[in-house]
Every structure is written in C-alpha cells, then in structure tokens.
From Swiss-Prot:
It catalyses: 5-amino-1-(5-phospho-beta-D-ribosyl)imidazole + S-adenosyl-L-methionine = 4-amino-2-methyl-5-(phosphooxymethyl)pyrimidine + CO + 5'-deoxyadenosine + formate + L-methionine + 3 H(+). Keywords: 4Fe-4S, Iron, Iron-sulfur, Lyase, Metal-binding, S-adenosyl-L-methionine, Thiamine biosynthesis, Zinc. Pfam families: ThiC_Rad_SAM (PF01964). This is Phosphomethylpyrimidine synthase. The keyword Iron applies.
C-alpha cells in the first residue's frame, strides 16, 4: 500500500507521523492532504535511511539540491562530498543527475548515505546507455527506458522526474509558435529527438500505465517534468508550456486514481510579473498538486549570480503557492558546481523558502524571526549566531569584523541604535 492509498482509507503511516511531528501539524490533517493529493511524502520502501519529508500545502517550503557526475567530471567521491555539503547546509532533498562514469554506483551511494529524500531523472541514464550500446540516443527502445526506471526504483529512489507531457501535439505547437531558446530541458530534448526520429509518441506518455505500475510497486512519487519549460524570459508562459501543463494535470489525475503520488515541475525563466500567474495556472490545472519550481530565474543576464536571480523568483513563487524549490547555484549556465557553489545554492534557496513561509504564515516561521529580533535587541551575539540560517557564515563575519567581547558591532560601534534607544527608554539592550 502506498502513502496515498493508506491516506485514502484513513490509515496513518509512520512516515505521516514523522512528517506531522517535524511540521508541527495534526497528523489527521496531514493525512487528509495526502489523500487529496495536495501533499506528497516521497518514501521508497527500499530507502532505509530516509527521514521522510512532506511537500505541499500547509507545510514548510522544501529545498532540493542537484548533484551528480558528468562525462567531464565522473568522480563519484566528489559528488558524495557535495551530498554532505548540501545536507549540512539544510537541503531537504537531493537529486542525482549523473551522466558520466559509474552512474549506478553513484546513485546507490547517494541513497545509502542520504537521510534526505532522493530523486533522479531516469531518462538521463537511459540515454547514456543507448549512446554507449547503439551509438545514438534515438535508438533507445521503450524497454531500455523502463528497465532503467525499474532499476532506479528498486534501488530506493524516492521520486523520479519523468517528462510525460512532452507529446507530439506539444512539440508541434512549439514548432508553430516558435521560441527564442527552444527546448532547454535535457530530458525534454532527449525525448523530443527520439520522438521526431522514430516518428513515435513519447514512451512515457504512451506507456504511462506501465510507469504507474512501477511507481506503485515501490511507492515512488512521480515528479512530472516540464520538458517545455522556458529557458529564457522571452519564452515564458507560451502556448507550448501551458499545453504541456494541461497534459500534466490530466496525468496527475491518472496517477491519483492508480494510488501513485504525483507532483508537478515548473519553470524555469519567468519575469517577476508572470510568476504568480504561473503558480495559479499549475494549482488550477493540476488540481492543487504540489508544485516543484526551478527558481524561477527572473533575469537572463546574471551568470555567476543565478543563485540570486533564482532566490528572488523562488521567494515570490513559493509565497504564491509553490511548494518545493530546486536550488540554482552560482555556476548555473557556466559549468558543474563546486562544493562552495552547492552550499551557496542551498542557502539562497532556503532563504527564499523561509521568506515565503513567513508570507504564508506557516507555524514556526514567524517565531524564528521574532527570536532573532529579541536577540538583536539584547545584543546577544551568541544567540543571533545560533538562530542564523547559516550560523557558520554569521560567526565568521562576527569574528573577522569585531573586537573580541565588543558589545555592539563595528558598523555602528558607540552609535549603536539598539543601545542608544534602549538607554533613553530606560530599557538597556543587554536586558531586553
């Protein structure tokens, strides 16, 4: 029985109890949200080290960190270091997007070591293997693809990105309308190339019931990928993107009917004034399925700073109702991220998520900020560092820029506003 099936018959699972305790919500309320499909709890029965997290309505905004080998950098040990950095920085989930070296070993090591939710994009491995076996990705067979999907599910992957909405109809609509950046999703481009070469429908769409059978067997959550996500602002919210979203909404319904949890992936590159509309469309067309967004990035001109462009968009998206943010690192559009890039990406996404949780009024979010305000008023530097989203960086700045034992900070010194006002009000900062 999957998490969804259990919830639908009123059965509280251990995963639901764990998530409810962490989120400080009633388990009965959480179960109702899971039963309705508005919350997913990705829990593969073979991921034994997992500490489950819930994604969806009424819960804290979650953050995912991508890692994985490439053909240029196939070092598994380096990616496992990134895994630990991401976990230490507070990532709720990680995705192994490996395309180089021993892909199976990398994934299995990530699953074995990660207490966080683990996701993959199976088409990546299927494509790499087709290239090695046949000399061309377009020669991949339907069975090749589903063999990889089942293998990854059996290994313990909690959710998989599957670009089921890239259909012949959607691709034709893209061709007719035209785009500046065309298709930027790797999975979407692989499938489009395969479809056009073989003159066949997307196997993930044509054989969706087969996909559902595998997902139900292992309780793998489907993350319905946006293969037509906009890769630049000029392409945002166009016909192809929305047509794919309509199809994904229909596939969400079919997944729920089959007892399989599903969430929906979203853009991408979106100008600020279109973000709220994108969230509204997903929630409406996909019947409030949890929304997993890549950023979105709000400008195309900041390579090297795209963790910031994504955090700006992510905060607005999550405040409008998105549930899950995929981090973007400073290396986005430029190269494979370093350990430092991974940390920066996770922290930026967490800031965005927390800012959104404040706007949503989620339990606990406001108390965290109130505690920080009290510590600042009291000039309690140790408490401020403890409460910081990134205590390590806060501690470094405090030590580097201030004399040991200084009551105020080096920005204001004797002219500290907290101290001066506290003294005039007869309420010294140190005792606030």
């Amino acid at each position: 029985m999957t998490q969804l099936e259990a919830a639908q018959v009123g059965q509280v699972t251990r995963a639901m109890e764990q998530v409810a305790a962490r989120e400080k919500v009633r388990v009965e309320d959480l179960m109702a949200e899971v039963a309705a499909g508005r919350v997913v709890i990705p829990v593969n029965k073979n991921h034994h080290k997992l500490q489950p997290c819930g994604i969806g309505r009424g819960l804290r905004t979650k953050v995912n960190a991508n890692l994985g080998t490439s053909t240029d950098y196939p070092d598994i040990a380096a990616e496992l270091e990134k895994l630990q950095v991401a976990l230490d920085a507070g990532a709720d989930a990680v995705m192994d997007l490996s395309t180089g070296g021993d892909i199976n070993e990398c994934r299995r090591q990530v699953i074995a070591r990660s207490p966080a939710t683990v996701g993959t994009v199976p088409i990546y491995q299927a494509t790499v293997e087709a290239q090695e076996k046949y000399g061309a990705l377009v020669k991949m067979t339907v069975d090749d693809l589903f063999r990889v999907i089942e293998m990854q599910a059996e290994d313990g992957v909690d959710f998989i990105t599957v670009h089921c909405g890239v259909t012949m109809e959607v691709v034709e609509r893209l061709r007719r309308e035209g785009r500046l950046a065309d298709i930027v999703s790797r999975g979407g481009s692989f499938l489009t190339g395969w479809m056009l070469h073989n003159e066949q429908e997307n196997p993930l769409y044509a054989h969706y019931d087969r996909l559902l059978e595998i997902a139900r067997r292992y309780d793998v959550t489907l993350s319905l990928g946006d293969g037509l996500r906009p890769g630049c602002l000029a392409d945002a919210t166009d016909r192809a993107q929305i047509q794919e979203l309509i199809i994904l909404g229909e596939l969400v319904d079919r997944a729920r009917e089959a007892g399989v949890q599903a969430m929906v992936e979203g853009p991408g590159h979106v100008p600020l004034n279109q973000i709220q509309a994108n969230i509204l469309l997903e929630k409406r067309l996909c019947h409030e399925a949890p929304f997993y967004v890549l950023g979105p990035l709000v400008t195309d001109v900041a390579p090297g700073y795209d963790h910031l462009t994504a955090a700006i968009g992510g905060a607005l998206a999550a405040a409008a109702g998105a549930d899950f943010i995929c981090y973007v690192t400073p290396a986005e559009h430029l190269g494979l991220p370093t350990l430092a890039d991974v940390r920066e990406g996770v922290i930026a996404a967490r800031i965005a998520g927390h800012a959104a949780d404040l706007a949503k009024g989620l339990p606990g979010a406001w108390e965290w900020d109130r505690e920080m305000a009290r510590a600042r008023k009291a000039l309690d530097w140790q408490r401020q560092i403890e409460l910081a989203l990134d205590p390590e960086k806060a501690r470094q700045y405090r030590r580097a820029r201030n004399d040991e034992g200084a009551v105020a900070c080096s920005m204001c010194g004797d002219f500290c506003a907290m101290r001066l006002v506290g003294e005039y009000l007869g309420k010294p900062s140190e005792t606030c």
